[in-house]
From Swiss-Prot:
Substrate binds at H270. Belongs to the NmrA-type oxidoreductase family. Isoflavone reductase subfamily. It comes from the Eukaryota. Coiled coil: none annotated. Unlike most other PLRs, this enzyme has an opposite enantiospecificity within the two reaction steps. Keywords: NADP, Oxidoreductase. PANTHER family: PINORESINOL REDUCTASE 1-RELATED (PTHR43349:SF4), PINORESINOL REDUCTASE-RELATED (PTHR43349). One of its GO terms (biological process) is lignan biosynthetic process. The active site is at K138 (proton acceptor). This is Bifunctional pinoresinol-lariciresinol reductase.
Length: 314
């Protein structure tokens, strides 16, 4: 892969900072969008300066200043947006429409990677509210990209390990339970777990690959496609601790929404689609439909196995 110039929008965020690091590591000329107010956030500022020390260029631009966005995207071949679309952090998906307009006006961008990195919104048209809002808004952004004829790649990264592996996919915690574990349904629905650093590696691999132009790239590392019960079994073997398993029927799981915040309801809905309906694995990836799978495209990437990821929690 020859080096290219890359602008990361949202480069101080959870996934964005990893994508910046992967871009730098793979030798790309990397630009990071810096918003005017960042100087008042010491953690974000220090992270940006650490990227600068490693060779990244900081580009000041604002979503409220169209011309500044146009100037920023004119500097690069590839734009990657990693703005948050989860309710419990922030919800900025539709801000990307301003970025689409800037890319359209600039006319030089060879690839745009919008902020997706989760479940494929094109397959979530029947998702329940309020979590469906995320998918609907991502489809609005897709429509704008495609109507503007902007070359693009959609990344469907499935379940981030930090949120779904270390906690054995339990709600309300990020670390493994010590005595009992809630099993969703029978716990045998297949799920896909991906280390966030691997999400970044696969994303950067895709940006100059002609095979991924105007396609959806699914991240399905084969050894990380497993059921929740299989995930629990891996942890039990590593820790030597057998957990009490409590099966939660679908109707009881959905009842957890009652009395919760909108953000919590969205999260519960997403869990339901993943662990009860199997939305991540209940379809075949079909190249004829504009779909590719990352581990097949890039077998050289040594992705982190669930077994190895869990070792940090021992």
């Amino acid at each position: 892969m020859k080096p290219c110039s890359v602008l990361v929008v949202g480069g101080t965020g959870y996934i964005g900072k990893r994508i910046v690091s992967a871009s730098l590591y793979l030798g790309h000329d990397t630009y990071v969008l810096k918003r005017p107010g960042t100087g008042l956030d010491i953690e974000k500022l220090q992270l940006l300066l650490s990227f600068k020390k490693r060779g990244a260029h900081l580009v000041e631009a604002s979503f409220s200043d169209h011309d500044s966005l146009v100037r920023a995207v004119r500097l690069v071949d590839v734009v990657i947006c990693t703005m948050s679309g989860v309710h419990f952090r922030s919800h900025n998906i539709l801000l990307q429409l301003k970025l689409v307009e800037a890319i359209k006006e600039a006319g030089n961008v060879k690839r745009f990677i919008p902020s997706e990195f989760g479940m494929d919104p094109a397959r979530m048209g029947q998702a329940m509210e309020p979590g469906r809002e995320t998918f609907d808004q991502k489809m609005v952004v897709r429509k704008a990209i495609e109507e503007a004829n902007i070359p693009h790649t959609y990344i469907s990264a499935n379940c981030f390990a930090g949120y779904f592996v270390g906690n054995l996919s339990q709600l309300g915690t990020l670390t493994p339970p010590s005595d009992k574990v809630i099993i969703y349904g029978d716990g045998n629905v297949k799920v896909v777990y991906v280390d966030e650093d691997d999400v970044a590696k696969y994303t950067i691999k895709a940006i100059e690959d002609d095979r991924t132009v105007n396609k959806t790239v699914y991240l399905r590392p084969p050894e990380n496609m497993m059921s929740q019960r299989e995930l629990v079994a891996v942890w039990e073997k590593l820790s030597g601790n057998q957990l009490e398993k409590i099966e939660l029927p679908p109707q009881d799981f959905l009842a957890l929404m009652e009395g919760t915040t909108v953000a919590e309801q969205a999260g519960i809905g997403h869990f339901y689609h993943i662990f009860y309906e199997g939305c991540l694995t209940n379809f075949e990836i079909n190249a004829e439909n504009g779909e590719e799978e990352a581990s097949r495209l890039y077998p050289e990437v040594e992705y982190t196995r669930v077994h190895d990821y869990l070792k940090i929690y021992l």
